From Swiss-Prot:
Protein name per its UniProtKB record: Large ribosomal subunit protein bL25
InterPro entries cross-referenced by the UniProt entry: Rbsml_bL25/Gln-tRNA_synth_N, Ribosomal_bL25/Gln-tRNA_synth, Ribosomal_bL25_b-dom, Ribosomal_bL25_C, Ribosomal_bL25_long, Ribosomal_L25_dom, Ribosomal_uL5_bac-type
A GO MF term: 5S rRNA binding
Function of the molecule: This is one of the proteins that binds to the 5S RNA in the ribosome where it forms part of the central protuberance.
NCBIfam families: bL25_bact_ctc, PRK05618.1-2, PRK05618.1-5, PRK05943.1
GO cellular component: cytosolic large ribosomal subunit
Length: 204
């Protein structure tokens, strides 16, 4: 599953000073590619190109074809370092992907049917999201773009846990496999309802 392409060049000028010069003078981003029983490789990316790639949420959970000076690597985005104020990418880590080796990656959660959830539509509750992504383990070909959380039947006061999610075939939720059935979302009483109740109690 390779839907994204990114171009890079081998980087030989290493160190913090060299990285700063790249970003300041050439509009380039230093990065490293590692894993897959190969030596880590330092590369540079065009800031504009990686910024455009990251506009698509799916890029974070898809295998990327990284062209490094004519050689192709299949990778996942493993980590990004961003400027604390301006938000642009300052450094990127890519993990090599091997077709027959399981990988771990963070996949976003997509919450659906929130407006028709029992606890919202019938009881006037509000939905709170505890987490927005999950770590999964699977073969590269099975890596999902996202995992859906169907809120339609969730009632007021009910908590949705990892064990309630339907992971695609071949996909394992890492935290759940380790015995951590994390809370994902819940429906609680609306603040407006709580405030109105408090005011009525005070009036009595």
């Amino acid at each position: 599953m390779v839907d994204f392409i990114l171009n890079a060049q081998v980087r030989s000028d290493l160190g913090k000073g060299a990285s700063r010069r790249l970003r300041r003078n050439a509009g380039l981003v230093p990065a490293v590619v590692y894993g897959g029983d190969k030596e880590p490789q330092s590369v540079t990316l065009e800031l504009r190109e990686i910024a455009k790639l990251l506009e698509n949420e799916a890029a974070f959970s898809h295998v990327i074809a990284l062209n490094v000076g004519g050689a192709k690597e299949t990778v996942l985005i493993k980590a990004l370092q961003r400027h604390p104020a301006k938000g642009f990418v300052m450094h990127a880590d890519f993990l090599r992907v091997v077709a027959d080796h399981k990988l771990t990656a963070h996949v976003p959660l997509h919450f659906i049917n929130e407006e028709v959830a029992v606890g919202v539509k019938q009881a006037g509750g509000e939905i709170s999201h505890t987490i927005s992504e999950v770590e999964v383990s699977c073969l590269p070909k099975d890596l999902p773009e996202f995992i859906e959380v169907d809120m339609a039947k969730v009632e007021l006061g009910q908590i949705v846990h990892l064990s309630d999610l339907k992971a695609p075939k071949g996909v394992e939720l890492v935290q759940l496999a380790h015995g951590n059935d994390l809370a994902v979302a819940n429906i609680h009483a609306s603040r407006v309802v709580k405030e109105e109740g408090s005011e009525e109690g005070a009036a009595e």
